[in-house]
């Protein structure tokens, strides 16, 4: 009988042992920057999906200058955060301001607004 009591007590203690701290929760997703690459073929990716608060980096891998601006041309009033990129010379990278408002922003190369391959969208979601 005593042995049964000891075994039962030990089992209860073992079940109750362990950390009283709750299991760690996975880290919240961080807002990581995203990249648009500009080449002689155009921008890639054409359509980019980012989280609110993200800054997008435009990398000019082309041999000529590009002036990235928000739609519509020539007013550039759609997403002012994109207009901070402005002129990007070959080999240079520039970031937008934080894209905070949930929406879709169109952009283009101001120097070549008619070239479809140099147009894209950033969706903040």
Predicted regions and their residues:
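N-terminal edge beta-strand
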Residues: 29-55
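Acidic glycine-/aspartate-rich tracts in secreted/extracellular proteins
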Residues: 61-64, 72-75, 113-114
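Beta-strand cores of secreted/periplasmic/IMS beta-sandwich domains, seen most often
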Residues: 46-69, 93-101, 105
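Ser/Thr/Gly/Pro-rich low-complexity, disordered linker/stalk segments of secreted
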Residues: 18-32
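C-terminal motif of bacterial Sec signal peptides marking the signal peptidase cleavage site
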Residues: 13-16
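Bacterial N-terminal signal peptides that target proteins for export
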Residues: 1-6
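Surface-exposed, flexible coil segments in extracellular/virion-facing regions
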Residues: 70-85
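Extracellular/periplasmic metallocenter environments
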Residues: 19-23, 86-125
């Amino acid at each position: 009988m005593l042995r049964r009591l000891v075994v039962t007590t030990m089992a209860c203690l073992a079940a109750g042992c362990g950390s009283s701290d709750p299991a760690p929760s996975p880290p919240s997703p961080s807002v990581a920057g995203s990249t648009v690459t500009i080449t002689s073929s155009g921008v890639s990716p054409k359509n980019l999906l980012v989280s609110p608060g993200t800054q997008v980096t435009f990398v000019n891998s082309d041999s000529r200058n590009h002036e990235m601006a928000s739609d519509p041309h020539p007013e550039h009033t759609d997403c002012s955060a994109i207009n901070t990129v402005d002129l990007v010379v070959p080999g240079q990278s520039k970031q937008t301001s934080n894209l905070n408002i949930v929406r879709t922003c169109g952009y283009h190369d101001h120097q070549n607004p008619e070239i479809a391959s140099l147009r894209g969208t950033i969706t903040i979601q």
